[in-house]
């Protein structure tokens, strides 16, 4: 009988990639949705990723409510806790933190009560980064972001607090359930549907000509397929117990992303911006456009993380950032989203 895996947040970009990867490996998958009307869309998205949806089932639960989580984990050997607020205006700071922290603790408590063997939780590289963007260099999993650092944006604070709360909870429980956490960078790559694309919207906006100029910012890019792969590796590897794993990739400036799209997407990339904005221009724009304020603090910074641990312990080898960006752009075009 195939092992059963619960994946939280089945409507999400990363969760769908994890579900598809699990189904392709023969696992039985149960995923959570808040809205029962989303079940058909999730199944269709997973099937578009060339995975059979025959072993996929659903449970309707909410990260902000206690009800239903014991039933959600029942019979599951593993849990991939992927669901989380994205940030960048997705919710108020208080809602973001409550969803991230409260939701994670609900999932973990249910997993412990239900005798789940392993929980793999999606955190973020932002939970293992210098407090400010003023420092550069390469950091690893031993670094924790200070959640009380002045000026820390709500998304970074929520991800850090949620992961800290998860580790504190598991340390105090002393049960047989084990925890591993995955800390991804900016998640791009092919899409499986036309909805819930927050992670790749910057690529779509560039292709649609909605970004007039390119700020001097960059991302450590991880492919959603590779991110799903590292979740599955951490799920079954005995050496992953009690460990954090950074899952970042190559750093690309936004100007390099634009160049890659123009080179790989042909005429459909005609609207990709070529104008590069000065730091001063971005800061001036940020004075009247709140959505640019989080970008302004990162101008010119190249914070990087080491993935040596994931390579050594899990044998994880991500694909190149340029391949990921190109595949993301072509996928958005195929879905008529750009």
Residue ranges of each PLM-predicted region?
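Glycine/proline-rich active-site loop of Rossmann-fold NAD(P)-dependent oxidoreductases
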Residues: 173-176, 189-201, 234-245, 338
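NAD(P)H-binding glycine-rich loop region in Rossmannoid oxidoreductase-like domains
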Residues: 36-37, 47-102
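Conserved Rossmann-fold NAD(P)-dependent oxidoreductase catalytic core, especially the SDR/UDP-sugar
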Residues: 81, 90-153
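A conserved pocket-lining segment of Rossmann-fold NAD(P)-dependent short-chain dehydrogenase/reductase
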Residues: 146-151, 193-194, 200-226, 233
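Mid/C-terminal beta-alpha module of Rossmann-like enzyme folds, strongest
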Residues: 230-294, 312, 323-338
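N-terminal Rossmann NAD(P)H-binding glycine-rich loop of SDR-like oxidoreductase domains
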Residues: 3-27, 32
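Active-site Tyr-X1-5-Lys
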Residues: 149-179
């Amino acid at each position: 009988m195939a092992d059963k895996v619960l994946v939280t947040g089945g409507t999400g970009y990363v969760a769908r990639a994890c579900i598809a990867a699990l189904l392709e490996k023969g696992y039985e998958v149960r995923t959570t949705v808040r809205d029962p009307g989303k079940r058909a869309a999730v199944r269709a998205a997973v099937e578009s990723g060339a995975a059979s949806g025959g072993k996929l089932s659903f449970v309707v639960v909410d990260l902000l409510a206690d009800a239903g989580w014991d039933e959600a984990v029942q019979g599951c050997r593993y849990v991939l806790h992927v669901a989380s607020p994205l940030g960048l205006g997705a919710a108020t700071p208080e809602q973001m933190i409550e969803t991230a922290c409260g939701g994670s603790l609900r999932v973990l408590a249910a997993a412990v009560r239900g005798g789940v063997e392993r929980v793999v939780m999606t955190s973020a590289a932002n939970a293992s980064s210098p407090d400010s963007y003023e420092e550069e260099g390469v950091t690893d999993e031993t670094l924790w972001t200070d959640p009380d650092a002045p000026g820390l944006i709500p998304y970074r604070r929520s991800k850090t607090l949620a992961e800290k709360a998860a580790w504190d909870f598991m340390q105090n429980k002393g049960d047989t359930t084990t925890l591993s956490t995955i800390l991804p960078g900016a998640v791009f790559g092919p899409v499986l549907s036309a909805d819930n694309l927050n992670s790749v919207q910057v690529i779509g906006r560039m292709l649609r000509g909605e970004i007039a100029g390119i700020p001097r910012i960059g991302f450590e890019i991880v492919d959603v397929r590779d991110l799903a792969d590292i979740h599955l590796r951490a799920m079954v590897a005995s050496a992953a117990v009690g460990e954090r794993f950074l899952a970042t990739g190559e750093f690309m400036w936004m100007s390099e992303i634009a160049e890659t799209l123009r080179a790989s997407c042909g005429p459909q990339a005609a609207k990709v911006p070529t104008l590069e904005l000065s730091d001063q221009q971005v800061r001036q724009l940020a004075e009247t456009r709140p959505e640019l304020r989080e970008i302004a603090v990162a101008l010119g910074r190249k914070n990087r993380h080491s993935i040596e641990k994931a390579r050594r312990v899990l044998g994880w080898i991500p694909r190149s950032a340029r391949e990921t960006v190109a595949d993301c752009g072509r996928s958005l075009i195929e879905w008529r989203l750009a």
